[in-house]
UniProtKB/Swiss-Prot annotation:
Homodimer and heterodimers with MORF8/RIP1, MORF3/RIP3, MORF6/RIP6, MORF7/RIP7 and MORF9/RIP9. One of its GO terms (cellular component) is nucleus. Belongs to the MORF family. Signal peptide: none annotated. The lineage of its organism: Eukaryota, Viridiplantae, Streptophyta, Embryophyta, Tracheophyta. Residues 1-57 form a transit peptide. This is Multiple organellar RNA editing factor 5, chloroplastic/mitochondrial. The keyword Chloroplast applies. Disruption phenotype: No visible phenotype under normal growth conditions. Keywords: Chloroplast, Mitochondrion, mRNA processing, Plastid, Transit peptide.
């Protein structure tokens, strides 16, 4: 049943992306890198090469309104292992990677992209000042997106906002330093890492981009949601 449900969900996502972009499915081996690439190409490239995640968020039809993603509490340590098995170190469902398409529009500057990230998160939490506090990293080159610290229920509200492609549970790039990678973003400003840590982040990011995915099971997040009902 789970496999059938996963295949059905993946099919719906693929059809929606194709109808949105009108592009054919390529076979890229790199993370999002060019702003001119169609939406579907971005999506496939990101998923096929980013081995930090086992699944994209898939929205399930839930009748009856009884499902609550946070019914076991907001802290990872409070949740039963069967409900909240971590996929990777740092993957606590409190840190989310929001992947976007063409933030700020065509030919946007880096600052315009960052402003778009802040404005996008502000739409669901109330203010840009609060959004700046919640965003912990930004990416404007290897892929377009930002990391934010919000609970799972709040993360659900990002789906469907303009420019939002995927909502992914984030995980550490540098486990030793509990670092999620990309460019550090603190209170609305990019903060530079110490040179040694920055070199390590670059090495780890490059290595993970080139490695084949370690996990091929795309249904774990779906199964987790099913277990939490």
């Amino acid at each position: 049943m789970a496999k059938t449900l996963a295949r059905s969900t993946a099919s719906r996502i693929t059809k929606r992306l194709i109808s949105t972009s009108g592009a054919t499915t390529p076979s890229p081996s790199y993370i999002l890198s060019r702003r001119s690439t169609p939406v579907f190409s971005h999506a496939v490239g990101f998923i096929s090469s980013l081995n930090r995640f086992t699944t994209i968020r898939t929205r399930m039809d839930r009748s009856g309104g009884s499902y609550s993603p946070l019914k076991s509490g907001s802290n990872f340590s409070d949740r039963a292992p069967t409900e909240m098995a971590p996929l990777f170190p740092g993957c606590d469902y409190e840190h989310w990677l929001i992947v976007m398409d063409k933030p700020g529009g065509e030919n946007a500057t880096k600052q315009q992209m960052i402003d778009c990230y802040v404005q996008t998160l502000a739409k669901i939490i109330g203010s840009e000042e609060e959004a700046k506090k919640k965003i912990y990293n930004v990416s404007c080159e290897r892929y377009f997106g930002f990391g934010c610290e919000i609970d799972e229920e709040t993360s659900n509200k990002l789906e469907g906002l303009p420019g939002v492609l995927f909502i992914l549970p984030d995980s550490y790039v540098d486990q030793e330093n509990k670092d999620y990678g990309a460019e550090l973003f603190v209170n609305g400003e990019i903060v530079q890492r110490p040179p040694e840590r920055q070199r390590k982040i670059i090495e780890l990011t490059t290595q993970r981009t080139n490695d084949k995915p370690k996990y091929h099971d795309k249904t774990r997040y779906v199964r987790r949601r099913e277990n939490m009902r």
